[in-house]
Amino acid sequence: MTTGFLQKIFGSRNQRLVKQYQKTVETINALETQIEQLTDDQLRGKTDEFRQRVAAGESLDKLLPEAFAVCREASRRVLKMRHFDVQLIGGMVLHYGKIAEMRTGEGKTLVATLPVYLNALAGRGVHVVTVNDYLAQRDAEWMARLYNFLGLSVGINLSGMEHEQKQQAYASDITYGTNNEFGFDYLRDNMVYETEARVQRALNFAVVDEVDSILIDEARTPLIISGQAEDHTELYVRMNALPPLLERQIGEEKADGTGVEKPGDYTLDEKSRQVFLTESGHEKAERLLAEWGLIGEGESLYAPQNITLMHHVYAALRAHTLFYKDQHYVVQNGEVVIVDEFTGRLMAGRRWSDGLHQAVEAKEHVKIQSENQTLASITFQNYFRMYAKLAGMTGTADTEAYEFNEIYGLETVVIPTNRPPKRIDKQDQIYKTAKERYDAVIRDIRECYERGQPVLVGTTSIENSELLSHLLKQAGLPHEVLNAKQHEREAAIVAEAGRPKRITIATNMAGRGTDIVLGGNAEKQAAFIEADEAIPADEKARRIKQLHDEWETLHEQVKAAGGLHIIGTERHESRRIDNQLRGRAGRQGDPGSSRFYLSLDDPLLRIFAGDRVRSIMDRLKMPEGEAIEAGIVTRSIESAQRKVEARNFDIRKQLLEYDDVSNDQRKVIYQQRNELLEAHDITETISAMRHGVITEVVRQFVPEGSIEEQWDVPELEEALRNDWQLDLAIQEMVNESSSITADEILDAVTTAADEQYEAKVAMVGRESFSAFERSVMLQTVDRLWREHLAALDHLRQGIHLRGYAQKNPKQEYKREAFELFAAMLDAIKQEVTRIVMNVQIQSPEQLEEAAEQIEERTGHLENVEYQHADYAESGAPVANVAAATAATATADMVGSAMTHGHAGELPKVGRNDPCPCGSGKKYKQCHGKLS
């Protein structure tokens, strides 16, 4: 109450910020007359003047009013577009490292030019980040005219570009590209073997378009560069036969033994997208696997030698029960292609991890591709937090303002619209069944079509869009379908979606980034005429004028019919996605309307609010085909959405807390790697490693400060001879001296190792040997880092089970991850020293050949896959994602953990310990019974 009272007096934080920026807008407007007087050359010359002032120490904040005024005038001359006052406010919000929420059609692309121009003056590079290559190329080509006029260079960073093109793009003042490509370039730069092979500069300032999509929707999806690992193709095929033989259990067993409506072999948790085998399911699976000869008679699935099978059992079950064709993936050209659940786009080339993709391929009877090993990975959360300054813009950020602030330290500022909005958002209509809902949708579309009003229908999946398309064909209504299967055409379809009688079906936010203009997009058609050299100039002018006249008529016709009407056929889990769909109507003060049609069969209602709404409908005795339209139901749905949003936020936050551990380690490894690349001579580093390793070896057999009776000299001699190529008669030294100490033995071995090393260097020359050492060290760091990443993933998969032992899983993860990291650093020293001391050299040519072989073995950038696999989607390590993942560690994982000193063997489970399956029961009452 007090807060509301104070807000009335002082205004909200948002209002105060906008008011503050308004004063700067007045300063910019006061400069307009003066700037208008400048010639084109004088206006262009302002850029050099500003650069000199920045170099002399003037801050960008102080330069802002003049730079914005110059950019606005240049835009007016080059693009024939003058920034509105609210767009200047948006530009300031971005410059100060905040998120600008601007409604659809308010000109976000133009707004970005202001802070981008200002920050590019510092000469440290500015990245403009978009969601796909099409938008990156479109915006770069469109705005390059303005930036080039002002004397700034513009680069485009697209996937598949040549190395030199990428370097050129990053060297430009302003670089446009996609979030994926910027992230992958960062990872690739930290996998190179020469400094000249890197493409990125230091990460200075990024403006992220559709910031909610990139920093929130995709925050759970790490970028992964991976290579092929061991082949388990045959096992996936055989496991694919298992799920059809198992039955789903309906209902969860309670403590008193009740709650199961229909017994079965597995249960599903649709919220967390996990599957769990029941006791009978385990018994049945073990019996079938024994019949197929995959496990021994009477063996348990939890036996150490069978853990890899457990991984395959769960992968096959999840593929059959939780992932559906044309909803989560499509089969195209004999390949399983993932569908992005947020945009409905196909994500070609991306694969689910943890064997799920192979299990889906086995289910669809297409060629099974090998499992991959992670070579490098980073989340968008940790990548974008590396920028010195980060800003973003979107039409819908306010519902996620808390998360932006909590995770990225970004404040959200809602920018006022240039004209007051006129869109009417109607109440949701809820039907009992999906059929009744679709009947109502078709009726609404027909009414709009008959009065000449354009309609945009939003669906949540390709399957639903094709179903609706089929129903519209039956109803004889012409329409366009915009989904992941046709996104080459999407910009063209969206541009024309505002014409009279136009019906467009779109999955979620396909076509996002392209405005729907009432009456159609005359500018696009005019551009085609302008580009046609066969048409004479006067004919071009006549046709373009005719186009604009026709557009004026159509524009008024659509406005009179009520503007664009938005129909949502289902509520999304996130209110923000619903708001994005609604936001396509009512741009720049145009009329428009929106309505959502729901049914009790929708996943959101069924899982979170179905019983409550169904009881309301039953009490009201609703006849078939009748909808419920009430505020209480809409509020109930929004409450369900808030629950899902809160849960997703918790998952993202938890993922970040766990990823921060590997991120800190990643920074250390990448920093050391870069120092290694840039160092002219690494002799001192190699020497320190050698002395450290030799000391460890000697101390193992001749402990420091010990007496002769405690020494094991024969074993030391054998270890030095076999492992380090040092043939020393230490026993003779001991026999000849009555007072030799442990330190003197260490000095003797160290001196011998140094002499052996110097002899090799003298044979081939310091420069050649140093190049060989660098290759060895880089290859070793990369290989052990890859194994370490796998070990961290596998540690994270089972770490939540520590909660049953009254331990904090996060603290345990941090502690064990640190131990793994320390073990990896020791392993790097051991491995590098072993290779350098064991290499046999006769000539410099032989050394070069050895270095080439090492680099060939590490030619990982030639045969890799770039994935953006959703961890939470694929059951990968989010700490509290269902306990069943505890059992999905493969035999490789165990081997990897053992290599890193994580565990000597798989721990034996005590009868009274919590069962490893995560049921919460004691082992003797759960899978102990099965063993």
From Swiss-Prot:
Annotated function: Part of the Sec protein translocase complex. Interacts with the SecYEG preprotein conducting channel. Has a central role in coupling the hydrolysis of ATP to the transfer of proteins into and across the cell membrane, serving both as a receptor for the preprotein-SecB complex and as an ATP-driven molecular motor driving the stepwise translocation of polypeptide chains across the membrane.
Catalysed reaction, written as an equation: ATP + H2O + cellular proteinSide 1 = ADP + phosphate + cellular proteinSide 2
Cofactor(s) the protein needs: Zn(2+)
GO BP field: intracellular protein transmembrane transport; protein import; protein targeting; protein transport by the Sec complex
Co-factor binding details: May bind 1 zinc ion per subunit.
Main location: membrane
Keyword terms: ATP-binding, Cell inner membrane, Cell membrane, Cytoplasm, Membrane, Metal-binding, Nucleotide-binding, Protein transport, Translocase, Translocation, Transport, Zinc
Subcellular location: Cell inner membrane; Cytoplasm
Root EC class: translocase
CDD domains linked: DEXDc_SecA, SF2_C_secA
Residues passing through the membrane, by range: none
InterPro entries in the cross-refs: Helicase_ATP-bd, Helicase_C-like, P-loop_NTPase, SEC_C_motif, SecA, SecA_CS, SecA_DEAD, SecA_motor_DEAD
Binding, Zn(2+): 915, 917, 926-927
Species per Swiss-Prot/TrEMBL record: Burkholderia ambifaria (strain ATCC BAA-244 / DSM 16087 / CCUG 44356 / LMG 19182 / AMMD) (Burkholderia cepacia (strain AMMD))
Pfam family, one: SecA_DEAD
Quaternary data: Monomer and homodimer. Part of the essential Sec protein translocation apparatus which comprises SecA, SecYEG and auxiliary proteins SecDF-YajC and YidC.
Cellular component aspect of the GO annotation: cell envelope Sec protein transport complex; cytosol; plasma membrane
Domain of life: Bacteria
Protein name: Protein translocase subunit SecA
Topology within the bilayer: Peripheral membrane protein
Entry-linked Gene3D superfamilies: Helical scaffold and wing domains of SecA (1.10.3060.10), P-loop containing nucleotide triphosphate hydrolases (3.40.50.300), SecA, preprotein cross-linking domain (3.90.1440.10)
EC number from the UniProt entry: 7.4.2.8
Binding residues for ATP: 87, 105-109, 515
GO molecular function, one term: protein-exporting ATPase activity
